[in-house]
Curated annotation (Swiss-Prot):
Its cofactor is Zn(2+). Binds 1 zinc ion per subunit. Component of the acetyl coenzyme A carboxylase (ACC) complex. Biotin carboxylase (BC) catalyzes the carboxylation of biotin on its carrier protein (BCCP) and then the CO(2) group is transferred by the transcarboxylase to acetyl-CoA to form malonyl-CoA. HAMAP family: AcetylCoA_CT_beta (MF_01395). SUPFAM superfamilies: ClpP/crotonase. This is Acetyl-coenzyme A carboxylase carboxyl transferase subunit beta. Keywords: ATP-binding, Cytoplasm, Fatty acid biosynthesis, Fatty acid metabolism, Lipid biosynthesis, Lipid metabolism, Metal-binding, Nucleotide-binding, Transferase, Zinc, Zinc-finger. Pathway: Lipid metabolism; malonyl-CoA biosynthesis; malonyl-CoA from acetyl-CoA: step 1/1. A zinc finger (C4-type) spans 31-53. It is an enzyme of class 2 (transferase).
Length: 297
């Protein structure tokens, strides 16, 4: 073997391999919209919103709650509840096995997390869908956790906010999942009767039984920028009506323009703007007014 091969080429290859292995996985992320390559720690500072094109990337339920609620005083509701395969359902795979796989992938027991806490000092209860858990589909546990959050709002007379991200009802639970549409709608009717605010935040995507029930029953309905919102997907509708749909059909901007939602708020502004809105809806001081009053005192 020549000295050149031993002295130059082999060490060069070894240095290259060491350099490759020293770069942690997941350190870089490509924006699915503009394809910009983004440094993960910097992306976290923008709450997973692309700084180049403002694309709002999908984030998990706990991440949403973490960036929305105050850090102190949180308590999870219904964390002990776990889904059960009562129908012994099987399509290409047993439902029980699908649940096990989803739980292992996400670290969650089901597709909704409910938590009480405070928003800029204001008592509140929040629910958030975990889209990575079987597409955020709504089954018995999702419905029950949502109802427990609403009942907490009723008992404590505090506002409720829900972040929806779902493909709809969970087909593996058949009529049990469809019943959750009525169940969640009924408890929201009680909130309205009691004059307790419910704000629905629609994130990408919201479809099916969730969009046809709780997601569209907010006193105020907010969409994140360019979120997909509808009942059936655009391709299904086009195949049914045999017509080309308008540009941006089912995007939050299209829905706002046609009066289906009330506001579009960027992720970084959700916390302060919803705090002000809820303070006005409940007759409390806004965070700004509270700070001014404290400064004067």
């Amino acid at each position: 073997m020549s000295n050149w091969l031993v002295d130059k080429l082999i060490p060069s290859i070894m240095r290259s391999e060491v350099k490759k292995s020293s770069v942690p996985e997941g350190l870089w992320h490509k924006c699915p919209s503009c394809e910009a390559v983004l440094y993960r720690p910097e992306l976290e500072k923008t709450l997973d919103v692309c700084p180049k094109c403002n694309h709002h990337m999908r984030i998990g339920a706990r991440a949403r709650i973490d960036i929305f609620l105050d850090a102190e005083g949180r308590a999870e509701l219904g964390a002990d509840l776990e889904p059960v395969d009562r129908l012994k359902f099987r399509d290409g795979k047993k439902y029980k096995d699908r649940l096990t796989a989803a739980q292992k992938q996400t670290g969650e027991k089901d597709a909704l997390i409910s938590m009480s806490g405070t928003l800029m000092g204001m008592p509140i209860v929040v629910s958030a869908f975990e889209f990575s858990f079987m597409g955020g589909s709504m089954g018995a546990i999702v419905g029950e956790r949502f109802v427990r959050a609403a009942n907490y709002a009723l008992e404590n007379r505090c506002p409720m906010v829900c972040f929806s991200a779902s493909g709809g009802a969970r087909m593996q639970e058949a009529l049990i999942s469809l019943m959750q549409m009525a169940k969640t709608s009924a408890v929201l009717a009680r909130l309205r009767e009691e004059g307790i605010p419910f704000i629905s935040v629609l994130t990408d995507p919201v479809y099916g039984g969730v969009s046809a029930s709780l997601a569209m029953l907010g006193d105020v309905i907010v969409g994140e920028p360019k979120a997909l919102i509808g009942f059936a997907g655009p391709r299904v509708i086009e195949q049914t009506v045999r017509e080309k749909l308008p540009e941006g059909f089912q995007r939050s901007e299209f829905l706002l323009e046609h009066g289906a939602i009330d506001l579009i708020i960027s992720r970084g502004e959700l916390r302060p703007r919803l705090a002000r809105l809820l303070a006005q809806m409940t007759g409390q001081q806004t965070p700004e007014e509270a700070r001014e009053a404290a400064a004067v005192a």
